[in-house]
């Protein structure tokens, strides 16, 4: 009885998988049966299945043991059992990369590939191409060409799919099969036509003109395969995204015509392609949306799901285009498939009116606990978008989100809710206290370190400015008592911010920080000691520098500079100005990296760090000092011209390095000694040009021009440069790429390049602008008033000022409240050379906009530059 029970228990539990407890050594021992005569197909099949199972489970096979098993398996070709033979093909494909001398089966596979048994031919082709390398491919080329045009569809498809894989090994050989692939593309079999189109596209994808011709041919002649139509639509949409013709192109007409295809798959692919095209207008979207609207009432759940998911994406950018589908979407709210119902509601949240929000939120509440975390995140994202659209509904959203926060769920789900509440708190001052209260409640029982530290950071930033800041201290100090080291350290930093901004709370905060100095963790003790000493000085400037605003430098850059400093001992103190500035605030960099991977990882170098390293490797630029700022690329040629050139401006303390990324788009020319000659205006001085040695067809190259900034007038920071690309041309054969021996000099005029005031200023966020304003002081303060007569709204004025100066808006002052006639804009940045620069701009709307600008810095030059450029 006991034995019977054990067996039954084993079958119902983990023992239900017959291969679960396989041992590699035992299976390899069993494989010796392959050498027995006569062959037992049933037993051999079972052993091959075990080998494939082990390989797919990630079991490591040594080269010797894999080769031994492989050679034993080759004897099974003597059997005529169909199932066993096809299992051999599978095993060959799996063991091709781990066994030696696999080419021993080439003759057997070639025999099967050209034999009369159609059931063997397709799998034999796939197995043969898996073991073939570039040197052997020519030996089977004749057979492959025949197979591609074979009348048996499974053989032709196998040959075409294998050709796609062989392109990675020997593109030139496969290119010779293009005529056969074109013949296969006219096949009546839907899969053969689809695979043939795939081969033709991949052979031509680097030649835009050839792809366009292919598309033109197939769109005119038509196709039998719905799969091939889907692929054509994808190719056409890819070309459309790169094209300048946009939606006037015949390609767009082709995609639109596919909306009337008889196959639902093709109709959906066309609708999806139109929706994902950039810069689509509501009128161009209308036919695609109409098709998706019909799919919403389809009896097939897959079609309903596809339609509502795609409409959900459209609603993000074009909510008005989806409004016509609202009735159909409302019918889907009660769909038996919860995924469809969720997407329907979230789409309605994006397209519905303010009055429908309460009703929709009530409907979501009824089933939100039944859906997966993935769809809960979609709901939260929709609510977040709704908060931006209808800020007055924040209280309804906040209540709903706080209830969701209490439910069970994974990290991504909780993170989405926390991010949404944080954005509501930051966008709506009246919701601040309610949002902070919900987050305080959440961190009392939060198992995610990343979220706890993020919330503590927010409490430190927003809590001190609330009417009763003391009520948050208990929640923060509880973290010091109850949590892990990372959360305790974040809590100490948050406490310090309360002490720095609230004089009445300072004595209590000092006591709490003294307790934190007894912590078991070094980081927590160090932070507590540091903040305690700073706060005891009771100086606003110190608080601003070391508590509110923190580091504004690149972390990888600082790590490298400190390492270099330790390698070369010096009596001079370490200079923080030698480190490139961070492109984003340090805390944002940190949180983003941490959210991606919970494990501590090294910060990835930023774009600016990479540029710094590249420029430092060039001898002429070694002594320019730290890279201050790199601009976004500026295009200096039209897209379809002979040469494509764009420029990145690298700003140093006293110099600018212009980096020209050049591409030669002519296949009958090789350019050599490529430089860009610059004629500056005013007092800029061109020091040297570093050429790109050669520019072969379609291969990008880089040349540089070094320019010294004006000495006499430091405020003359803006200027225009005329640019001419000079080079030596060597004509070459377009087919072989071999250039002529002799060349001739030529030049190409580029568009003018402007250096603006924003190129000299790096954005830096000051979380507490008032403290930073006091810290900089009024030693070099200047104030002027300007009339912006051509500007009609405060929003336009704010956007123009931010864009022109290239500075970072602080305290969310880039958002202008509704129905206001005046507004204050706070901007922060660092001027070239490492000088903090703050701008306070008071705007008033009357006949145009009047602007009073106050500028502060610790040096005179940045202040003069700002006022001179604005004036």
UniProtKB/Swiss-Prot annotation:
Chain positions found as Phosphothreonine: 594
Subcellular localization, as worded in the UniProt entry: Cytoplasm, Cytosol; Golgi apparatus membrane; Cytoplasmic vesicle, COPI-coated vesicle membrane
Name of encoding gene: Copg2
Name of the protein: Coatomer subunit gamma-2
Subunit description: Oligomeric complex. Binds to CDC42. Interacts with JAGN1. Interacts with TMED10 (via cytoplasmic domain).
Gene3D superfamilies: Coatomer, gamma subunit, appendage domain, Leucine-rich Repeat Variant, TATA-Binding Protein
Annotated Gene Ontology cellular component terms: COPI vesicle coat; COPI-coated vesicle; cytosol; Golgi membrane; growth cone
Organism: Mus musculus (Mouse)
Ranges: HEAT repeats: 64-101, 283-320, 321-355, 356-392, 395-430, 467-504
Membrane topology of this protein: Peripheral membrane protein
């Amino acid at each position: 009885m006991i034995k019977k029970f054990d067996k039954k228990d084993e079958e119902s539990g983990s023992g239900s998988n017959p291969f679960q407890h396989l041992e590699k050594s035992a299976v390899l021992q069993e494989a010796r049966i392959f050498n027995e005569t006569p062959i037992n197909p049933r037993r051999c099949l079972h052993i091959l299945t075990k080998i494939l199972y082990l390989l797919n489970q990630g079991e490591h096979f040594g080269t010797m043991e894999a080769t031994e098993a492989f050679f034993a398996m080759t004897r099974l070709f003597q059997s005529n059992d169909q199932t066993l033979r096809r299992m051999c093909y599978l095993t060959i494909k799996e063991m091709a990369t781990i066994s030696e001398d696999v080419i021993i089966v080439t003759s057997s596979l070639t025999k099967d590939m050209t034999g009369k048994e159609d059931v063997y031919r397709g799998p034999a082709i796939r197995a043969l191409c898996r073991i073939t390398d570039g040197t052997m491919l020519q030996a089977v080329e004749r057979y492959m060409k025949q197979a591609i045009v074979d009348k048996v569809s499974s053989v032709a498809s196998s040959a075409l799919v294998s050709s796609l894989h062989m392109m990675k090994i020997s593109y030139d050989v496969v290119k010779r099969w293009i005529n056969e692939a074109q013949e296969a593309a006219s096949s009546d079999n839907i899969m053969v036509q689809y695979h043939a189109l795939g081969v033709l596209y991949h052979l031509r994808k680097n030649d835009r003109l050839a792809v366009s011709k292919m598309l033109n041919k197939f769109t005119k002649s038509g196709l039998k395969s719905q799969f091939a139509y889907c692929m054509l639509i994808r190719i056409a949409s890819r070309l459309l995204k790169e094209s300048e013709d946009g939606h006037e192109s015949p390609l767009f007409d082709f995609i639109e015509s596919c909306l009337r295809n008889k196959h639902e798959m093709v109709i959906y692919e066309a609708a999806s392609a139109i929706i994902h095209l950039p810069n689509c207008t509501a009128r161009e979207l209308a036919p695609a949306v109409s098709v998706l609207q019909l799919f919403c009432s389809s009896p097939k759940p897959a079609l309903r799901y596809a339609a509502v998911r795609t409409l959900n994406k459209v609603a993000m950018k074009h909510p008005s285009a989806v409004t016509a589908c609202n009735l159909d979407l409302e019918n889907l709210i009660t769909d038996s498939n919860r995924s469809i119902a969720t997407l329907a509601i979230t789409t309605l949240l994006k397209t519905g009116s303010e009055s429908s929000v309460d009703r929709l939120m009530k409907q979501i509440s009824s089933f939100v606990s039944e859906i997966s975390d993935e769809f809960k995140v979609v709901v939260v994202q929709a609510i977040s978008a709704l908060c931006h659209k209808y800020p007055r509904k924040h209280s309804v959203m906040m209540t709903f989100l706080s209830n969701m926060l209490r439910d069970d769920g994974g990290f991504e789900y909780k993170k989405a809710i926390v991010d949404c509440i944080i954005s509501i708190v930051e966008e709506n001052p009246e919701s601040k206290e309610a949002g902070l209260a919900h987050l305080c409640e959440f961190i009392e029982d939060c198992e995610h370190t990343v979220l706890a530290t993020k919330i503590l950071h927010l409490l430190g930033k927003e809590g001190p400015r609330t009417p009763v800041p003391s009520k948050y201290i208990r929640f923060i100090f509880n973290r010091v008592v109850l949590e892990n080291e990372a959360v305790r350290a974040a809590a100490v930093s948050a406490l310090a911010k309360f002490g720095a901004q609230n004089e009445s709370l300072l004595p209590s905060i000092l006591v709490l920080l003294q307790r934190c100095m007894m912590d078991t963790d070094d980081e927590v003790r160090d932070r507590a000691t540091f903040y305690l000493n700073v706060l005891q000085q009771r100086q606003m400037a110190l608080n601003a520098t070391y508590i509110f605003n923190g580091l504004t430098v690149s972390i990888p850059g600082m790590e490298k500079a400190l390492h270099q400093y330790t390698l070369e001992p010096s009596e001079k103190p370490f200079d923080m100005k030698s480190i490139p500035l961070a492109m984003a605030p340090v805390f944002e960099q940190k949180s983003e990296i941490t959210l991606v991977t919970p494990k501590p990882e090294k910060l990835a170098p930023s774009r600016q760090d990479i540029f710094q390293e590249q420029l430092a490797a060039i001898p002429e630029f070694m002594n320019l000092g730290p890279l201050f700022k790199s601009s976004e690329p500026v295009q200096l040629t039209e897209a379809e011209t002979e040469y494509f050139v764009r420029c990145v401006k690298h700003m140093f303390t006293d110099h600018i390095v212009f980096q020209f990324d050049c591409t030669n788009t002519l296949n009958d020319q090789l350019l050599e000694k490529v430089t860009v000659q610059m004629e500056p205006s005013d007092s800029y001085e061109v020091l040297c040009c570093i050429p790109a040695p050669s520019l072969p067809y379609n291969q990008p190259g880089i040349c540089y021009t070094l320019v010294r900034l004006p000495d006499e007038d430091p405020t003359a920071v803006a200027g225009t440069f005329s640019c001419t690309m000079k080079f030596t041309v060597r004509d070459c054969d377009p087919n072989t790429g071999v250039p002529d021996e002799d060349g001739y000099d030529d030049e190409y005029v580029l568009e003018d390049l402007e250096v603006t005031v924003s190129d000299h200023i790096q954005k830096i966020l000051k979380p507490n602008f008032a403290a930073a304003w006091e810290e900089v002081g009024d030693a070099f303060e200047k104030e002027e008033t300007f009339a912006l007569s051509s500007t009609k709204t405060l929003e336009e004025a704010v956007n123009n000022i931010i864009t022109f100066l290239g500075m970072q808006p602080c305290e969310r002052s880039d958002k202008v409240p509704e129905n206001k006639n005046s507004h204050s804009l706070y901007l922060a940045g660092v001027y070239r050379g490492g000088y903090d620069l703050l701008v306070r701009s008071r705007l008033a709307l009357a006949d145009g906009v009047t602007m009073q600008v106050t500028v502060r810095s610790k040096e005179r030059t940045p202040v003069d530059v700002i006022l001179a450029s604005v004036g």
